[in-house]
Amino acid sequence: MEQHTSNPTKEKAKEEDSVACFCPAKSSPSYIDLPANFTPANFLTIQTKLSSGAGQKPKGCLGVLECMYANLQLQTQLAQRQIAILENLQASLSQPGSGRESKNCSLPGLCCKLLLNHLPQFHK
């Protein structure tokens, strides 16, 4: 009686062969207008020469990685700008004589010093 035993290594190799690269994503509703001379390669240099043999990825995958890296760079810049805005706001609220007396606070029941204590401290 002949038993058929499956080889897990061969099955895994078949799965890897059937995996395809992702297609480029469609534009997002939160569209960011990039400069006309933008190229993802400016942000990331990838060594495209892979070792010979199995396991080589199509060049399209590298393009996706470059776009993801560029997206992370843009998100980092935006986050840094937001932190700078919050730091400026915090500094302006903590200046003495800014005309903001606790009795003139616009939020009922809270004074501006209480608000300052609840603002997170940001460090560069």
UniProtKB/Swiss-Prot annotation:
Tissue specificity: In testis, expressed in the inner luminal layer of the seminiferous tubules.
InterPro entries per UniProt: SSTK-IP
Pfam family for this entry, one: SSTK-IP
One annotated Gene Ontology cellular component of this protein: cytoplasm
Domain of life where this protein originates: Eukaryota
GO terms, molecular function: Hsp70 protein binding; protein kinase binding; protein kinase inhibitor activity; protein-folding chaperone binding
Keyword Amino-acid biosynthesis annotated: no
Keywords: Chaperone
Keyword Cytoplasm on entry: no
Family: Belongs to the TSACC family.
Role summary: Co-chaperone that facilitates HSP-mediated activation of TSSK6.
Subunit comment: Interacts with HSP70. Associates with HSP90. Interacts with TSSK6; this interaction is direct and recruits TSACC to HSP90.
Name by which UniProt lists this protein: TSSK6-activating co-chaperone protein
Species the sequence originates in: Mus musculus
